[in-house]
A protein has these predicted regions:
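Short acidic/proline- and small/hydrophobic-mixed sequence motifs that coincide with surface turns
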Residues: 390, 401-406, 444-445, 491
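Beta-sheet-dominated interaction scaffolds and their linkers
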Residues: 364-399, 438, 442, 469, ...
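Short active-site neighborhood of thiol/selenol oxidoreductases, capturing the structured segment around
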Residues: 493-509
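Terminal connector regions
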Residues: 442-470
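C-terminal motif of bacterial Sec signal peptides marking the signal peptidase cleavage site
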Residues: 17-18
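N-terminal "domain-start" segment that seeds a small globular fold
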Residues: 466-494
Length: 509
């Protein structure tokens, strides 16, 4: 009697390929809807604003922004925002550049602005009276600038207003308290407190001021007596603490590399860190609305469910990009830096490097979210001899709330390969793509890496690949370079011969 196993063995002997392990099924993309949906990209007179702060006022649905300029936006319909006033620049004594601002706060029709100062601009407190309509267009405002306050030795950062008092972070000088003369609009200092560290962010609730310090702390200050403020307590947040938002007894701090930090300040004399959540980039500013914390984190804007303060839960993120006119064909759009954020319920307002955006939050949705390193925009394999290879590992991560499928990874040039061609990552999981360059000539070679995934916000990501690239590049010698320094001396690259050299870009804003 012939057994079934004998038949199977005979068939396999005749057709070996038919009995080999079946090929794995190809990975197919899932179908997801993003928790954050774009409503509007607001293009005004200027398309490169470098927005620092945006703040939303619920009483009239105005959105205020500080950037290269100051502006007021009608945000009653977040999908159809419009400028009420824009491109306003401050006239500052002794400064011909007419700067914008970095921080803002309001007191009715008076909106205060501050600038910390830099190599090109002096520091100041000023602002705008927005009570007047434009006679040529009654739908728009015609703001008038407030008098400028400049105090010897001071530098001004975050600002907030409560009960007619204006509270300003003075960096290494602590916190300053001011009052405005209603007739002249001139600010005068009424009190101050030092010894707080390098202060940056300010929010006031009743008679308590919450202040962040760049050393990584949140401080509480009693201002019941404005002339004699008193330090109440301090919580160590870690990182570089900048922006903050306060709701009831809870404070939310954007703490740089520490990400989002949640502080319980129910005991003002002993505030305590109760929760943290990492951010992809440097957390700069934060807002709070209806159980959610919204974080401007340099590389993206992020939303967390903070209904359980000890365990902030990531909901979603938005990475905004802009096209840059690179000379190379195939370069990916660059990440547009995000420094400002504001929220009203499910309406999210993002202050991007270029222009403001509005998004609608759908907190009930789950979706994958692909994170790639910024250097993917220019992956330089350095000099490689003809016929030789060089492999670079690229970290990929799914920061989303459901599995991420990279269902098609490929390159446009035979000189470059990527493996694996498909990859699946669970929520929160990281993996690697191996990029290999095989030099086919001694000349420069270029290609584009394509990553197709089921991330609903960025289903197609690309990277620019170069090998044997001309000019300054990874692994290539630095040509003789001379630099005139600000102190009048000179620096030459020969001074750092055979040493690793960091080339840094610096600009003043």
């Amino acid at each position: 009697m012939l057994k079934l196993s004998d038949i199977t063995l005979s068939v396999c002997a005749l057709t070996v390929s038919a009995c080999s392990s079946p090929a794995p099924s190809p990975l197919l993309p899932g179908r997801y809807e993003s928790p954050l949906v774009l409503m509007q990209r607001l293009q005004g007179e200027v398309g490169h604003l470098h927005i620092d702060e945006v703040r939303y006022r619920a009483s009239d649905a105005n959105l205020f922004q500080c950037s290269y300029t100051f502006g007021v936006i009608d945000a009653r319909d977040p999908s159809s925002m419009r400028y009420l006033a824009e491109n306003l620049r401050h006239t500052i004594p002794g400064d011909r550049r007419r700067p914008g601002c970095i921080h803002l706060a309001w007191d009715g029709d008076v909106v205060y602005t501050t600038h910390r100062g830099n190599l090109s601009n002096p520091t100041f407190i000023s602002g705008w009276d927005i009570s007047t309509k434009d006679p040529e267009d009654r739908r728009r405002m015609k703001p008038t600038q407030l008098p400028v306050l400049q105090e010897a030795g001071e530098s001004y950062e975050g600002i907030d207003v409560e009960n007619g008092f204006v509270y300003v972070a003075l960096k290494d000088r602590g916190l300053g308290i001011y009052r405005r003369n209603a007739k002249t609009n001139v600010l005068s200092r009424v009190g101050s407190i030092g010894g707080l560290g390098s202060t940056w962010g300010v929010r006031v609730r009743n008679q308590t001021v919450f202040v962040t310090a760049l050393e990584g702390s949140l401080l509480t200050v009693d201002v019941a007596d404005a002339a004699h403020p008193k330090l109440l307590g301090k919580a160590t947040t870690g990182g570089v603490a900048r922006g903050l938002a306060v709701d009831g007894a809870m404070a939310y701090v954007a703490a740089g590399s520490e990400g989002l930090v949640v502080v319980d300040a129910s005991d003002l004399t002993n505030p305590k860190v109760v929760g943290k959540s990492p951010t992809r980039g440097t957390a700069v500013r934060v807002d709070y609305s209806q159980g959610h914390a919204f974080v401007a984190a340099w590389n993206d804007a992020r939303v967390y469910d903070v209904s359980r303060p000890a365990s902030p839960r990531f909901i979603g993120a938005v990475r905004l990009t802009t096209d840059v006119m690179y000379p190379d064909h195939g370069r990916a759009a660059a990440t547009g830096r995000t420094l400002g954020i504001a929220a009203n319920g499910n309406d999210v307002f993002i202050g991007n490097w270029w222009v403001p955006y509005s998004y609608r939050l759908h907190a009930d949705r789950t979706a994958p979210s692909l994170v790639l390193p910024e250097e993917i925009n220019l992956t330089d394999f350095g000099p490689v001899a003809r016929g030789e290879t060089h492999t670079i590992d690229v970290d990929v991560r799914n920061q989303g709330t459901t599995p991420l499928t990279l269902f098609s990874n490929w390159t446009t040039s035979n000189a470059f390969t990527v493996a694996p061609e498909q990859l699946k990552l669970a929520a929160g999981e990281s993996g690697k793509l191996q990029l290999t360059y095989r030099a086919t000539t001694g000349e420069a070679e270029k290609g584009v890496l394509n990553i197709w995934s089921d991330d609903p916000l960025q289903p197609v990501r690309t990277g620019f690949l170069v090998g044997n690239h001309g000019g300054l590049g990874v692994g290539q010698p630095l040509p003789e370079t001379r630099v005139a320094l600000l102190d009048g001396s000179q620096w030459t690259s020969s001074q750092v011969q055979k040493k690793v050299t960091l080339l840094a870009y610096f600009a003043t804003f």
